[in-house]
Amino acid sequence: GVSCLCDSDGPSVRGNTLSGTLWLYPSGCPSGWHNCKAHGPTIGWCCKQ
């Protein structure tokens, strides 16, 4: 999967660990995962286990 920046990772991608996984399904994150970015990326969701 493609990594994405969770809100808990910090304000920007520079120098921060990207702990989320970009999820492209319109229904949201898979079972047992949660959306870790409040406003969401441009496409899909940023999900974390």
Swiss-Prot record:
<keyword id="KW-0872">Ion channel impairing toxin</keyword>
<keyword id="KW-0528">Neurotoxin</keyword>
<feature type="disulfide bond">
    <location>
        <begin position="6"/>
        <end position="36"/>
    </location>
</feature>
<comment type="similarity">
    <text>Belongs to the sea anemone sodium channel inhibitory toxin family. Type I subfamily.</text>
</comment>
<dbReference type="GO" id="GO:0017080">
    <property type="term" value="F:sodium channel regulator activity"/>
</dbReference>
<comment type="function">
    <text>Binds specifically to voltage-gated sodium channels (Nav) (site 3), thereby delaying their inactivation. This toxin retains the greatest capacity to discriminate between the cardiac (Nav1.5/SCN5A) and neuronal sodium channels (2.5 nM versus 120 nM, when electrophysiologically tested and 14 nM versus 400 nM, when tested by ion flux), whereas its paralog Anthopleurin-B has the highest affinity of all anemone toxins for the mammalian sodium channel. Its ability to differentiate between cardiac and skeletal channels appears to be associated with domain 4 of the channel.</text>
</comment>
<dbReference type="GO" id="GO:0005576">
    <property type="term" value="C:extracellular region"/>
</dbReference>
<dbReference type="GO" id="GO:0042151">
    <property type="term" value="C:nematocyst"/>
</dbReference>
<feature type="site" description="Key residue for high affinity and preferential inhibition of sodium cardiac channels versus neuronal channels">
    <location>
        <position position="12"/>
    </location>
</feature>
<dbReference type="GO" id="GO:0090729">
    <property type="term" value="F:toxin activity"/>
</dbReference>
<keyword id="KW-0800">Toxin</keyword>
<dbReference type="InterPro" id="IPR000693">
    <property type="entry name" value="Anenome_toxin"/>
</dbReference>
<keyword id="KW-0738">Voltage-gated sodium channel impairing toxin</keyword>
<dbReference type="InterPro" id="IPR023355">
    <property type="entry name" value="Myo_ane_neurotoxin_sf"/>
</dbReference>
<keyword id="KW-0964">Secreted</keyword>
<feature type="disulfide bond">
    <location>
        <begin position="29"/>
        <end position="47"/>
    </location>
</feature>
<keyword id="KW-1015">Disulfide bond</keyword>
<feature type="disulfide bond">
    <location>
        <begin position="4"/>
        <end position="46"/>
    </location>
</feature>
<keyword id="KW-0166">Nematocyst</keyword>
<dbReference type="Pfam" id="PF00706">
    <property type="entry name" value="Toxin_4"/>
</dbReference>
<keyword id="KW-0123">Cardiotoxin</keyword>
<protein>
    <recommendedName>
        <fullName>Delta-actitoxin-Axm1a</fullName>
    </recommendedName>
</protein>
<dbReference type="GO" id="GO:0009966">
    <property type="term" value="P:regulation of signal transduction"/>
</dbReference>
<feature type="site" description="Key residue for high affinity and preferential inhibition of sodium cardiac channels versus neuronal channels">
    <location>
        <position position="49"/>
    </location>
</feature>
